[in-house]
């Protein structure tokens, strides 16, 4: 194989852990792992380690969990490791310029989009919501900007009409490690060919909010159906009925024109709950009232038919 590189790995969630697992099987030397500090989780708010920390400790790797990499003593931790390259995957901390320049080959990042489209925090969700035909991963050389570095390698995959953010996440978690290992080989061999991003093609994937996931019936049925898939499994699209939030897990588009005001319930039957939108009809198929499990529209109608009387409006 190519030269074995000394690698610092920096990442936090499961998506990152899958990349670390691939690195550990690749023949490279992972000398240390950086991950976010343990966070309170679950009903008991017990401090929980990140998936990356769990895997690293299983493999006997040194783990560092700084709150920031700005303090000089934390930067010295990186410098002392004398790494060839630092691999960053969904780490969650900003890397100062000094840290970016410490490894011999710099720092590289696995980003969940085909850059320069969808720079930023939520590329998977934004690509789905926008109706993109494909997405993928980009391995890039990091610089001080937000996902602005030169591109080293790309892998793409189609976005299907059934994809949710959850299914796309899994697809990219398979592609990312493949692209990462290939890129490391090219860096080790000196065959990598950095490509500057075209600034005229840049779009930004802003962080998601729960309020943004509230269904806006003035949008088209097609937009709302994509929104429901984009926000599944988090933060989940939702509507409010009698002061209660109701999550929407699945819906379909009915290409029939209607003059009814957006949000008007047109039909409620075993085929679903049909609601007028700004353009077309959205058929709600799977919903989850507060404190309940997700259920079919038919099952919800059996217990809460009064919520979905045709002619009433959802807001």
Curated annotation (Swiss-Prot):
GO CC terms: cytosol
Record InterPro entries: Fmt, Formyl_trans_C, Formyl_trans_C_sf, Formyl_transf_N, Formyl_transf_N_sf, Formyl_transferase-like_C_sf, GART_AS, Met-tRNA-FMT_C
Enzyme Commission (EC) number: 2.1.2.9
PROSITE patterns in UniProt: GART
Binding sites annotated in the UniProt record for (6S)-5,6,7,8-tetrahydrofolate: 113-116
Top-level division of the source organism's lineage: Bacteria
GO MF, any single term: methionyl-tRNA formyltransferase activity
Record's catalysed reaction(s): L-methionyl-tRNA(fMet) + (6R)-10-formyltetrahydrofolate = N-formyl-L-methionyl-tRNA(fMet) + (6S)-5,6,7,8-tetrahydrofolate + H(+)
Keywords carried by this UniProt record: Protein biosynthesis, Transferase
Family as reported in the entry's similarity comment: Belongs to the Fmt family.
Function recorded in the entry: Attaches a formyl group to the free amino group of methionyl-tRNA(fMet). The formyl group appears to play a dual role in the initiator identity of N-formylmethionyl-tRNA by promoting its recognition by IF2 and preventing the misappropriation of this tRNA by the elongation apparatus.
Listed HAMAP family: Formyl_trans
Protein name: Methionyl-tRNA formyltransferase
Species: Escherichia coli (strain SE11)
Lineage, top ranks: Bacteria, Pseudomonadati, Pseudomonadota, Gammaproteobacteria, Enterobacterales
Protein's gene: fmt
């Amino acid at each position: 194989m190519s030269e074995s590189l000394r690698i610092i790995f920096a990442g936090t969630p499961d998506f990152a852990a899958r990349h670390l697992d691939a690195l550990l099987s690749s023949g490279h030397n992972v000398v240390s792992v950086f991950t976010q500090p343990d966070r309170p989780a679950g009903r008991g708010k017990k401090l929980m380690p990140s998936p990356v920390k769990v895997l690293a400790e299983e493999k006997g790797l040194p783990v560092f969990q700084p709150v920031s990499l700005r303090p000089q003593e934390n930067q010295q931790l990186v410098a002392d490791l004398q790494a060839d390259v630092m691999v960053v995957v969904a780490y969650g901390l900003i890397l100062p310029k000094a840290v970016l320049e410490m490894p011999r080959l710099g720092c590289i990042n696995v980003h969940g989009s085909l850059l320069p489209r969808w720079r930023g925090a939520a590329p998977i969700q934004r690509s789905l919501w926008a109706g993109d035909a494909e997405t993928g991963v980009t391995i890039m050389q990091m610089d001080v900007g937000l996902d602005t570095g030169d591109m080293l390698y790309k892998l793409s995959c189609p976005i299907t009409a059934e994809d949710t953010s959850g299914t796309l996440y899994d697809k990219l978690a398979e592609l990312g490690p493949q692209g990462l290992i290939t890129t490391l080989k090219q860096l080790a061999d000196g065959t990598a060919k950095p490509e500057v991003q075209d600034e005229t093609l840049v779009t930004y994937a802003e962080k998601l909010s729960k309020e943004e996931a509230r269904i806006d019936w003035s949008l088209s049925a097609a937009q709302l159906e994509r929104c429901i898939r984009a926000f599944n499994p988090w933060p989940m699209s939702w509507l409010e009925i009698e002061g209660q939030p109701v999550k929407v897990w699945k819906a379909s588009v009915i290409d029939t024109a209607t003059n009814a005001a957006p949000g008007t319930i047109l039909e409620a039957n075993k085929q679903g709950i049909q609601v007028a939108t700004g353009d077309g009809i959205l058929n709600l198929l799977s919903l989850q009232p507060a404190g309940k499990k997700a259920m079919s529209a038919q099952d919800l109608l059996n217990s809460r038919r009064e919520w979905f009387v045709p002619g009433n409006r959802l807001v």
